[in-house]
Regions:
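Activity-critical C-terminal alpha-helical subdomain
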Residues: 101-150
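Alpha-helix capping and helix-loop boundary segments enriched in small/acidic/polar residues
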Residues: 2, 15-22, 44-47, 62-69, ...
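Flexible loop/turn segments at secondary-structure boundaries
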Residues: 51-55, 62-66, 96-101, 128-129, ...
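Ferredoxin-type iron-sulfur electron-transfer modules in oxidoreductases and energy-metabolism complexes
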Residues: 69, 134-155, 165, 171-209
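Structured core elements
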Residues: 18, 44-46, 55-57, 88-91, ...
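C-terminal substrate-recognition/cap domain of FAD-linked oxidoreductases
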Residues: 1-73, 79-81, 85-86, 96-97, ...
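Feature representing long, continuous alpha-helical segments
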Residues: 29, 54, 76, 80, ...
Length: 209
């Protein structure tokens, strides 16, 4: 897959946006321009053009603050293009924390506050998907990002999506494939930090074996 061929140490981020038919071609040219400007020219794009729905996958390097800042600038530029063409920031898939900070930009202050009012009526304690659909933190989409450390040339191809787990014959015997890879990556990080005698390392090593 494209994700398996991405540069080592990068993550795979998938988004989907939508435009009206009459502006779709021009809008897509602008989206491709933004992708290229930010070094994501190798993005994989596909979609359902009759619905104006476009998916894309990019592979940013977020292992350092510079990469995170670069990704943040890309997202803001992408949102600007979508809003300029009066498009939708989400099409088939849920909003999620990656787009939540931009919901207000898309719908405007009045409708956004109405959304919050409805949210408080049904979820006064904010326990249902807090911050996933509505979030007042403008930087939430670049916080608590899951980085993928270098561990092994083969394992580095994995994006931890879990799609392989249902087919794995060992998933009910020991660890699932994703669990094993996550532990392997953490062991690699701890070893690089010289923490091979730590309690955490020993516990993970025991689980891995």
């Amino acid at each position: 897959s494209a994700a398996g061929r991405r540069p080592r140490g990068t993550v795979s981020i998938i988004e989907d946006i939508a435009f009206r038919e009459e502006v779709l071609g021009e809008a897509l040219e602008q989206v491709r321009g933004v992708l290229s400007d930010y070094g994501y020219g190798n993005a994989v794009m596909w979609g359902h053009l009759l619905d104006g729905n476009v998916h894309f996958t990019i592979f940013p390097d977020i292992n350092a603050q510079e990469g995170i800042d670069h990704y943040a600038s890309f997202m803001r530029s992408l949102v600007d293009v979508v809003l300029y063409y009066d498009g939708s920031l989400k099409a088939e898939h849920g909003t999620g924390r990656n787009m939540a900070p931009f919901v207000k930009d898309e719908w405007g202050e009045e409708i956004y506050e109405l959304m919050w009012k409805i949210k408080r009526l049904f979820d006064p304690e904010n326990i249902l998907n807090p911050g996933v659909l509505l979030n007042r933190d403008p930087d939430v989409f670049i916080k608590n990002l899951k980085q993928i450390p270098l561990a092994n040339e083969l394992i580095d191809k994995c994006i931890e999506c879990g799609f392989c787990e249902i087919q794995c014959p060992s998933r009910h015997v020991t660890l699932t494939p994703r669990q094993r890879i996550v532990i392997y990556r953490e062991l690699s990080v701890l070893a690089e930090q010289g923490k091979t005698i730590s309690k955490r390392y020993k516990e993970l090593k025991r689980a891995f074996n």
